[in-house]
């Protein structure tokens, strides 16, 4: 297996350290065969479409309906934290507290716990980034302190097996059951958790729901979407595959269930009580292995504040000082025109319901204008939250999109060039196209780029370089601090014309126009490509020649796409 050293003389980084890190680029070329030895095929994907195979979300809902809550012989209630690492407005945690309070009326010795489960194989298989994992570990420590004030212990369980094993396995079910029984001394336990919509995670929950040990009662809740998947359908009862009509119905649905004139979403707030009479805070004994951090420059291990308070503060600051300029500044590469909330949303440090509630108060009671083109900056900010819901709804309806397959199965016929050298140069910001290189270097050094940056580089990889969009999708997941699988797959599908509500195949971003529009003074480019600082019209000798001619590569892409589609 080829391993390449990433080297950069980036001026931004050189003040601290060079980025000289061994990296295996081949891991991005396909799904990890260790975890997915038999990846889904086109035929298998179509089984979801023709209803010959049940969708995992439908199975979860069907099994849930069979569940009945019983407090008989139950001594413990436990909330299983996943991507919902917060106390404020957490549906599953709120339900857990409510169930515990009911149980306490029957069993005065009942206990309330919280748990987070680590499976490093899940991280490897899903290519979770070291940036994000560092943030999560910091958030867990902060969450443990916050829960301690409520006398709720946060347990940290590590799932390991001799073989590489995902959590959607019978081994995990046995592990989870044993851990729960250890906590409850063999008596009944009620576990609450918020649903994760990726296929692997849904199959994990299906296995747990199918577990026949009646001492375990699992209660799953919708939490990460403003509107739960399945509630917004066409007049024929099918799922939307185009955003705009879906978005209009989303707005209608949210307005119909508006809580009050000042709040549009119902929030789930737990009381600040001491829930267990006795409590002992036990520090976590887990540290992230080096393998998850080795491609991140140590000098850049400077993460955003991981606390819930920091997320709330960012939201307040954005709505108070920046949201009015969102339409004009969100795409600019050299400005911080976005909210900076994405990592907090991805890890669940803040709920999207709270975000929409706060933003709603700045919209004069209207979260969408009659004509979308007239949306205010804050209304368009809310629209971005809706996009996140949309991609989650779509992933539930077309599960194969989280299994390494495109929404448009006909695009599997595209004859990608898949030049591994070109891919490495794209990854490391050495394509010879300044705007692309600046964006990719920033991603390497910071773990974050804005949405416009993602669109520019995704279009260049899939159209100009004719490299399978899934290579880039995996690279982004491995390097983004806010990597979210449904949004990442959705965004790459849009730019590569292979996904849901994608741009037409003949739309290829013009890199020169993108640079002039979103970095007109080359402030961003010169920050991240210092080779160009002193150059005027000449290409410096220490800066690579363009990998492709933009005009000719566009023409090539149009032909290849047209032949396949």
What are these regions (language model features)?
Residues 2-258, 263, 441, 487, ...:
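Trp/Phe/Arg-rich N-terminal binding region typifying the photolyase-homology
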Residues 8-36, 72-73, 237-410, 519-565:
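Glycine/tryptophan-enriched, flexible segments
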Residues 79-81, 116, 136, 140-143, ...:
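Long, contiguous hydrophobic alpha-helical segments, chiefly transmembrane helices and signal peptides
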Residues 92, 139, 143, 311-318, ...:
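Alpha-helical packing segments of well-folded alpha/beta enzyme cores
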Residues 126, 130, 134, 302-305, ...:
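Charge-dense, low-complexity intrinsically disordered segments
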Residues 196, 497, 531-533:
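Short, loop-centered acidic/histidine patches that primarily coordinate divalent metals
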Residues 340-526:
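Active-site-proximal binding-pocket segments
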């Amino acid at each position: 297996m080829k391993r390449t050293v990433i080297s950069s003389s980036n001026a931004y980084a050189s003040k601290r350290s060079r980025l000289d890190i061994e990296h295996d680029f081949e891991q991005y070329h396909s799904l990890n065969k260790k975890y997915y030895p038999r990846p889904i095929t086109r035929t298998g994907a179509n089984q979801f479409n023709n209803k010959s195979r049940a969708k995992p979300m439908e199975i979860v809902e069907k099994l849930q309906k069979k569940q009945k809550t019983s407090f008989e012989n139950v001594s413990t209630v436990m909330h299983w934290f996943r991507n919902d690492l917060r106390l404020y407005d957490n549906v599953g945690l709120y339900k857990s507290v409510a169930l515990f309070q009911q149980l306490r009326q029957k069993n005065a010795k009942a206990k309330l716990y919280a748990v987070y489960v680590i499976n490093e194989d899940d991280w490897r298989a899903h290519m979770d980034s070291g940036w994000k994992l560092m943030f999560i570990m910091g958030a867990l420590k902060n969450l443990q302190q916050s829960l301690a004030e409520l006398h709720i212990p946060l347990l940290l369980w590590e799932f390991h097996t001799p073989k590489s094993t995902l959590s959607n396995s019978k081994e995990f079910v046995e592990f989870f059951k044993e851990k729960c029984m250890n906590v409850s001394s063999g008596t009944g336990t009620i576990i609450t958790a918020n649903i994760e919509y990726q296929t692997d995670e849904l199959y994990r929950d299906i296995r747990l729901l199918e577990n026949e040990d009646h001492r375990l009662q699992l209660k799953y809740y919708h939490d990460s979407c403003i509107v739960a998947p399945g509630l917004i359908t066409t007049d024929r009862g099918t799922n939307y595959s185009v955003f705009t009509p879906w978005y209009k119905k989303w707005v209608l649905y949210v307005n119909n269930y508006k809580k009050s004139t000042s709040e549009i979403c119902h929030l789930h707030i737990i009381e600040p009580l001491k829930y267990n009479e006795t409590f002992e805070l036990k520090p976590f004994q887990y540290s992230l292995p080096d393998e998850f951090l080795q491609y991140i420059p140590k000098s850049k291990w400077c993460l955003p504040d991981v606390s819930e308070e920091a997320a709330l503060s960012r939201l307040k600051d954005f709505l108070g000082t920046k949201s009015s300029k969102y339409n004009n500044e969100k795409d600019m590469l050299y400005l911080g025109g976005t909210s900076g909330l994405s990592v907090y949303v991805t890890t669940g440090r803040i709920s999207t319901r709270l975000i929409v509630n706060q933003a709603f108060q700045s919209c004069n009671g209207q979260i969408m204008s009659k004509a979308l083109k007239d949306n205010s900056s804050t209304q368009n900010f809310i629209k971005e939250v809706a996009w996140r819901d949309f991609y989650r709804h779509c992933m539930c309806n077309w599960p194969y999109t989280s299994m390494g397959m495109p929404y448009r199965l006909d695009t599997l016929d595209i004859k990608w060039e898949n030049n591994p050298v070109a891919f490495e140069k794209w990854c490391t910001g050495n394509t010879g196209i300044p705007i692309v290189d600046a964006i990719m270097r920033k991603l390497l050094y910071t773990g974050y780029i804005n949405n416009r940056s993602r669109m520019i580089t995704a279009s260049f990889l899939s159209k100009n370089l004719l490299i399978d969009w899934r290579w880039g999708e995996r690279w982004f997941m491995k390097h983004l601090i806010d990597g979210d699988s449904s949004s990442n797959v959705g965004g790459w599908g849009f730019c590569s014309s292979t996904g849901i509500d994608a741009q037409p195949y003949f739309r290829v971003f013009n890199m020169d126009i993108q640079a002039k529009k979103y970095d007109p003074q080359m402030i961003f480019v010169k920050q991240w490509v210092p080779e160009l600082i002193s150059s005027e019209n000449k290409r410096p000798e220490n800066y690579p020649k363009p990998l492709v001619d933009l005009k000719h590569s566009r023409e090539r892409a149009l032909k290849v796409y047209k032949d396949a589609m």
